[in-house]
Amino acid sequence: MKRKLTICLLIALIFYNGNAKAAERGSLEELNDLSDTVFQMTRQAKYEEALQVLEYFEKTLKSAEKKQQDPMLTGAQIRQITLGYNDMVRSLKQADTSDTQKLRAAAQFRMLMDAVDNRSDPLWGSLEKPIMEAFTELKRDVQKNGSTSFHEKWNEFISLYDLIYPSLTIDVSEDQLETVGKHIDVIEQEEFQQMTESTKLERLSLLQHDLKNVFDRVEEDDADPSLLWVIITTGSIIITALTYVGYRKYKAEKNKLKKRDYPK
């Protein structure tokens, strides 16, 4: 009798855990879908509608957190989602924010939520090719001693890296991101231009190698055509307008609070 009771309890526990996991998966999937809706609304310049979806997104996130006995998101994930959400709302509400900046914020938020929901083949992984191909041109400019062209290509690279950086904080270890960040800091220093050609190429190769390691952790997947459209159509504009402001901000927030969990 005791054995039968134990078996029944185990089955009930397994069934409960299965339902909890399914509910958690459903909530994350819904949040991911909502971020895509925000992206599509922003792409069509339907900003009021996008804000309404974001309002529902916030309510859904809070509701999902309250319903789960075990938090479906870590404190770090909640913090990154909150940062992305606030950026998205702010960009849509500010009158002086250009359509390009709004669309970029939407693409960034879209990839962030996909990274939270999709751990095997996140959307940010599909941007490996344009990001890694930048090194060929950067090295070519170093060899030709074309400083102006190098800076343009570098800002282009940083602009793409900025686009996926929030997503990387979800999927990539802090140590890996810090290593990549240190390489970027070195190249951005004025002293970099005073280095010999061989040293510059070595620094670029180190960054290239560690970034390749970051991308190697995800499965290859086809790029989202909508996101590629954003990159292609806004690329030349965002280089000068945005450079790497977002990257700096997320990096500063990460370093500032890396040992403190987001309060619940």
Swiss-Prot record:
One matching Pfam family: Spore_YpjB
Translocase listed as a keyword: no
Cellular component, GO annotation: membrane
Superkingdom of origin organism: Bacteria
Positions of transmembrane segments: 227-247
Signal peptide limits: 1-22
Localization per Swiss-Prot or TrEMBL: Membrane
Alphabetical UniProt keywords: Membrane, Signal, Transmembrane, Transmembrane helix
Primary subcellular site in the record, as a coarse category: membrane
Topology within the bilayer: Single-pass membrane protein
Record protein name field: Uncharacterized protein YpjB
Organism in which the protein naturally occurs: Bacillus subtilis (strain 168)
